[in-house]
């Protein structure tokens, strides 16, 4: 998810 990447970058 685009917004999710900014909030918590999943590795």
From Swiss-Prot:
Disulfide bonds: none annotated. GO terms for biological process: neuropeptide signaling pathway. The modification Threonine amide is found at residue 11. Keywords: Amidation, Neuropeptide, Secreted. It is found in: Secreted. One of its GO terms (cellular component) is extracellular region. It comes from the Eukaryota. Mediates visceral muscle contractile activity (myotropic activity). Belongs to the periviscerokinin family. This is CAPA-Periviscerokinin-1.
């Amino acid at each position: 998810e685009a917004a999710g990447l900014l909030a918590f970058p999943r590795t």
